[in-house]
Regions:
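N-terminal Rossmann NAD(P)H-binding glycine-rich loop of SDR-like oxidoreductase domains
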Residues: 3-23
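NAD(P)H-binding glycine-rich loop region in Rossmannoid oxidoreductase-like domains
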Residues: 46-103
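Conserved Rossmann-fold NAD(P)-dependent oxidoreductase catalytic core, especially the SDR/UDP-sugar
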Residues: 102-152
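Active-site Tyr-X1-5-Lys
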Residues: 147-177
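Glycine/proline-rich active-site loop of Rossmann-fold NAD(P)-dependent oxidoreductases
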Residues: 161, 173-175, 186-196, 231-241
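Alpha-helical substrate-binding/gating segment
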Residues: 198-207, 213-249
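Mid/C-terminal beta-alpha module of Rossmann-like enzyme folds, strongest
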Residues: 231-283, 317-318, 323-333
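C-terminal amphipathic/interface module of NAD(P)-dependent oxidoreductases
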Residues: 287-333
Length: 333
């Protein structure tokens, strides 16, 4: 199988490329030239990649030849949300997602042998900030203007809606389209979300964030890859699919289980005002920590998909073990 991954030079692309490449599939990553060059110099994260092809995410070029004849396209392109939401970054987040998605659709539409499935990154952030009930694809409430949610959080939701709308508008009648409403994908890769959270725990700072009631949705890297395989194989599934473990849990419990898995006896909590100051210093937004994302994988479960890591406690132990193992390997290299 040939898998093409536009925007695949980041953490998620690395996770997918390693897994699919190890299975013997041909993995081609499309990346902006600086990203592609950096990834090429870092062999561990980009294991499994047959080749990295340059693209600008804005214009058709030689990269489109890779799409023609591919079996699957997994579009991960988009400016990172881990930044301050000023006017420049807001425009970049919207433009990079909408423009690249439209471009991928154009390449697929022009292909003589289009891929049979287009897996398009979206986000679980599209759902409302809520504590009372989980959001699945059938009954979940899309966010925007809900009580208790800061108005500035609406921006991320509108970005996600524009992303999915662009996918829906793409005229690719010979290619099945799936929007991946993904939760945070946890892997031991350095610089990823798990590595960031674990760094807090290792420094004694991994306590409750805010009041700790906000739900954290997540998925282990192995289940993320397995879910992609399942979606590729099930020709009857299209549209939005929640790619998240079935066990979201409040932040206080989430961090407690992570501390337990690492063996950290304490973790200092962070109030909302402390998080606000930290977000400014780290050039990010508190929404990434304080929004309640209670998302469950309704369609995956209904279709018979089984999770290797359905509960965070087991996933946290496995990820901590993997992080330690990789640290030892790097020291011994």
């Amino acid at each position: 199988m040939k898998l093409v991954i536009p925007g695949g030079t980041g953490q998620i692309g690395s996770v997918v490329a390693r897994a699919f490449g190890k299975e013997g599939h041909e993995v081609v990553v499309l990346g902006r030239t600086p990203d592609a060059a950096r990834a090429a110099r870092t062999p561990r994260p980009m294991q499994g990649v047959a080749r990295i092809v340059a693209w600008d995410g804005a214009t058709l070029g030689e990269w489109a030849r890779e799409v023609d004849g591919a079996d699957v396209v997994l579009n991960l392109a988009g400016r990172s949300v881990n930044c301050r939401y000023g006017p420049t970054n807001r425009a970049a987040m919207v433009d990079s997602r909408v423009r690249s998605t439209r471009l991928v659709g154009e390449a697929i539409a022009r292909a003589a042998r289009p891929p049979r499935v287009w897996l398009q990154a979206s986000t679980a952030t599209i759902y409302a900030h809520r504590y009372d009930a989980p959001n699945d694809e059938a009954t979940g409430i899309l966010g925007g203007g809900e009580p208790g949610s800061p108005e500035k959080w609406d921006f991320s939701i509108e970005v996600a809606k524009a992303w999915e709308r662009t996918l829906a508008e793409a005229a690719t009648p010979r290619t099945r389209k799936v929007a991946l409403r993904s939760a945070m994908t946890m892997s031991p890769d350095r610089g990823g979300i798990f590595d960031t959270l674990l760094a807090l725990v290792r420094r004694g700072l991994g306590g409750t964030s805010g009041d700790g009631r906000q739900y954290v949705s997540w998925i282990h890297e192995r289940d993320f890859v397995r879910a992609l395989h399942w979606l590729i194989e099930h020709d009857d599934v299209d549209g939005a699919v929640n790619v998240a473990a079935p066990g979201p849990l409040p932040n206080a419990e989430f961090m407690r289980e992570l501390r337990k898995a690492w063996g950290a006896p304490i973790g200092l909590p962070a109030s909302e005002w402390m998080l606000a100051i930290g977000a400014v210093l780290m050039r990010t937004e508190t929404e990434l920590i304080l929004k309640s994302r209670r998302v469950v994988p309704g369609r995956l479960l209904a279709g018979g998909f089984t999770f290797e890591f359905g509960e965070w406690s087991a996933a946290a132990r496995d990820l901590c073990d993997a992080w330690r193992r990789e640290s030892r390997e790097r020291r011994g290299a």
